[in-house]
Amino acid sequence: MRKMMQREVTYTTAQLARMKMVDGEVTAEVLEPVTLIGNLSVEQAQREINKRSEFKENPAQVVGVEANTQLYELPLDVFLEHATVKERPATKEEVAEVQA
């Protein structure tokens, strides 16, 4: 039996629209939803959208957000194959030992 690694991930789906002038009237062109990492408010999602290069030329307005949390699972051997090893920060006890 393979060991599995699980992780809950929260993401926000932002619904976007782009405002256009058509025959002297302002209309909203609905764009494809964008997925952002984390549980974001409309204001936070708008800031993230404004940072993206594809919206620099033609800005888009966030008209709604929907947060979701899902549980993801990956075999441990696949995780180890793709993961990057990071050094953990020193604990207070380890720092005290070095200073003593």
Curated annotation (Swiss-Prot):
UniProt keyword terms in alphabetical order: DNA condensation, DNA replication, DNA-binding, Early protein, Repressor, Transcription, Transcription regulation, Viral DNA replication
Gene Ontology molecular-function annotations: DNA binding
Gene Ontology annotations of biological process type: chromosome condensation; DNA replication; viral DNA genome replication
Family matches, as Pfam families: p6 (PF17548)
InterPro entries for the chain: Histone-like_p6
Annotated S-S bridges: none
Annotated DNA-binding residue span(s): 1-19
Subunit relationships: Homodimer. Homomultimer. Binds to double-stranded DNA giving rise to multimeric nucleoprotein complexes.
Known function: Histone-like nucleoprotein that binds to the viral dsDNA and responsible for wrapping and condensing the viral DNA about 4-fold. Forms a nucleoprotein complex in which the DNA adopts a right-handed toroidal conformation winding around a protein core. Binding specificity for the viral genome is based on supercoiling. The formation of the nucleoprotein complex at the genome ends, for which the binding affinity is highest, activates the initiation of viral DNA replication. The binding of p6 would recruit the complex formed by the TP and the DNA polymerase to the origin.
Annotated protein name in UniProt: Double-stranded DNA-binding protein
Gene: 6
